[in-house]
Amino acid sequence: MSTKLILSFSLCLMVLSCSAQLWPWQKGQGSRPHHGRQQHQFQHQCDIQRLTASEPSRRVRSEAGVTEIWDHDTPEFRCTGFVAVRVVIQPGGLLLPSYSNAPYITFVEQGRGVQGVVIPGCPETFQSDSEFEYPQSQRGRHSRQSESEEESSRGDQHQKIFRIREGDVIPSPAGVVQWTHNDGNDDLISVTLLDANSYHKQLDENVRSFFLAGQSQRETREEGSDRQSRESDDDEALLGANILSGFQDEILHELFRDVDRETISKLRGENDQRGFIVQAQDLKLRVPQDFEEEYERERGDRRRGQGGSGRSNGVEQGFCNLKFRRNFNTPTNTYVFNPRAGRINTVNSNSLPILEFLQLSAQHVVLYKNAIIGPRWNLNAHSALYVTRGEGRVQVVGDEGKSVFDDKVQRGQILVVPQGFAVVLKAGREGLEWVELKNSGNAITSPIGGRTSVLRAIPVEVLANSYDISTKEAYKLKNGRQEVEVFRPFQSRDEKERERFSIV
């Protein structure tokens, strides 16, 4: 009897242990651990009296591109835990494989290229330098190869690669290796937001990058200040270094026994002055189309189902097959559209499930000439607004009821808006476009005006007593705008008549 109890108890412990290890890969991250994010977030009180719209404060050049870093020691960056980086890859350039100790989300602002993702424990289901193996239904006249012939024709096998283009959102978990190649004719420009307050980051408040090749190039900041010397260590950790350069030659040679000493030296990045973005003009990659990627996922499932008991571990079936890309211009991503004012496109955990695990999301907002959005605030996230086109005016009001930002913004600037701070944006004569990167898998905004606003949900009598106005004025206040979040500019009666006449 006692033996059965001991066995049962041991089995329960084993099941609980396995469940604890696998829980991060499962869906439903609403109940996040408290010790991670809060530990870093509340080490100091944040008293934000002023926000700034800023451009990168440091540029590091490589052979085939530039890495630009925003000053993350300002109050708004430090308190929200955001770290922002912009990478410019020249045509033919290759951003070397690397990983970070913090999850991040990347927006492709310009260009096209190829992205690679390497997930530990997942199979190599992609092939290069060989004829692609299509499903039986698509082979047509192709004869069936024997197993040995198929093995010999596979060529190089690797994990998933996919094409990226302007408007794509690309997330990455902490510790997952990614690389990027620009095979287009224009510069490939991307902006990345790293979440330093994520519970995935275990060590301290610093974001660290780790490269698997190359050697960094150090350059001084474009703007000199006393504070820059104190920031040097943080920036160097963010820029990263080749982790193989720290291992001895003997260890690497023992590990990679089929390579010579010269290759070992190149693995360590010795005498490599190219930086972390290198020229790879001759690099040719066979990138699967969307239907081929779907087939590879199915093919990987079949492979894992063969042999042994025919079972797979569940983690491979879920995490290995997750998508790592979503384009803002996909019709299903349209959240709000106003033909006279603009539109809002959203990529969150509903459209890209991996964002539920990372607790990150993004919005793309397009405002037409003189159109307005807001005032509105984020219920459950901070946001970093990166302007991609045009210019406009932004006002942000904090918890003391005072303006903490009232200025114009333009292309290339980032404005960090903390959770709960109300923001309104008005486009200029050329319109205004921006991307909002947020630290929540399903960020929720609450508008003050419009058909879905908080004022619309409050009874007229409550509004009248709250603002000490008549019920008639309260009704007009509540129902004056029928649009949703994005508002067309105000027009006088004469302007409306001219518009009606021009349409006729």
From Swiss-Prot:
Entries under InterPro entries matching the protein: 11S_seedstore_pln (IPR006044), Cupin_1 (IPR006045), RmlC-like_jellyroll (IPR014710), RmlC_Cupin_sf (IPR011051), Seed_Storage-Functional (IPR050253)
Protein name as catalogued: 13S globulin seed storage protein 2
The UniProt record lists the keyword Signal: yes
Keyword terms: Disulfide bond, Seed storage protein, Signal, Storage protein
Classification via Pfam families: Cupin_1 (PF00190)
Superkingdom as given in the UniProt entry: Eukaryota
Signal peptide bounds: 1-20
Organism: Fagopyrum esculentum
Gene designation: FA18
